[in-house]
Amino acid sequence: VFLRDGDIVSGSNWTIRSIHTPGHCSNHLCFELVEEACLFSGDHVMGWATSVVGPPDGSMKDYMVSLRKLLSFNHEQYWPTHGPAIPDPIEYVQSFISHREEREDQILEYLKHGPRKIADFVPEMYEKYDKRLWYPAAGSVHAHLLHMVETGRAEVTDDHREPKLTATYQLL
């Protein structure tokens, strides 16, 4: 079954609407159980942490747009793939948006000190976290930097100008 944004699947006493929420991955869908005003949020909104947004299939721009899109619904609860149920999803999603905006501000602050590689500042940004999380965190930082390159706030300084995980970035 192929579903697009807004497609409906229904039975005698239930209706499920698909909501395209790219970001974690380009083809991610959440599923709204209309009668219960709840959302099966999959990997887009997890019950214990923000999703890893890892390029090339993950996009921070898409992730942020999709989070804001979910705010336009009036869901009473989310059921994520990972973690517990989320009883106050609007406040929870807003906290994810704020968290990602704060991370982006952190990255901009690091880049104010000159060209840097992701590996130069991930240990500082995530020093309070288990080191095993640093590699996925680097993927999310990379997604932030790609978004900053796309929006003209940063650039790659390496010879090939390819915005990859090992590239050197600087502010524009």
PLM features: residue spans?
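Alpha-helix-centered segments that form part of catalytic cores
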Residues: 1-12
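A short catalytic or substrate-binding loop motif that flags glycine-/basic-rich loops and adjacent residues
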Residues: 3, 22-25, 163
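Metallo-beta-lactamase
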Residues: 8, 15-106
